[in-house]
Amino acid sequence: MEPMEPMEPVAVWQGRYGDPVPLFGPLPGVRDGRAIAYEYALPESFEPRPGRNRLQRTFLLTDVGVALAQPCWHRATTGAGDIVPGVDPGQDEPAWYVDLMHVTDRGHEVVARDLYIDVMVPTDGRHQRLLDLDEFADAIEDGGLPADAAVDGLRRWQRFLDTYVHRDRDPRAAWSDFPPKAIENLAALPSPLGPVVTWEG
């Protein structure tokens, strides 16, 4: 692990692109260079994975505008009583879930809005799985996602894939830099990062 550099507290607001303000937040976070870690708690309807609690830590890479997390929950129960399985419920360690984001960085305050496209990146040799390109296309078609934001998002998404997942031209047996080394120091910080804020759904 690289030597610890000075870190800065940061407040994070989270939502989907086009959501009205205020978004969910402010969430306690810590900045380390181009990476930010922040946390929030899930409600009791979410059952945590073995050895985990309902406190979800998420990382932002501000250079490419993506958020990544290993989901802390095993399954959730809806208000109607239906069971929703989490990511990789049959695996000891879930794949990382990576979201394309629109990030507004104001220094001590960061606004992160979900831009629909996701990829699941396992660390056990399984292949990646790209998700929700249809939702991205629907948002453009419906007028909810302006063309300039869509173009910028796709360019940043390709840069994320090329930098962190598959840097070489041809496929390799391992990811280029995933989980990113940039989050190592943040991942080692004890929880909670600050006052716990619970997501109410």
PLM-predicted stretches and their roles:
Residues 156-201:
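Cysteine/selenocysteine-centered motifs that mediate thiol-based redox chemistry or coordinate metal-sulfur cofactors
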Residues 36, 41, 46-54, 60, ...:
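Intrinsically disordered terminal and processing segments
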Residues 45-48, 106, 136-140:
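A short local loop/turn or secondary-structure capping micro-motif enriched for an aromatic residue
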Residues 115-163:
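A hydrophobic, small-residue-rich beta->alpha segment in the mid-to-C-terminal subdomain
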Residues 98-101, 105, 110, 154-156, ...:
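A long amphipathic alpha-helix within ATP-dependent nucleotide-binding catalytic cores
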Residues 1-56:
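Charge-rich, low-complexity N-terminal segments
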Residues 28-31, 60, 120-121:
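Well-ordered beta-strand positions
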Residues 60-117:
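Structured beta-strand/loop patches that form or line metal/cofactor-binding pockets in enzymes
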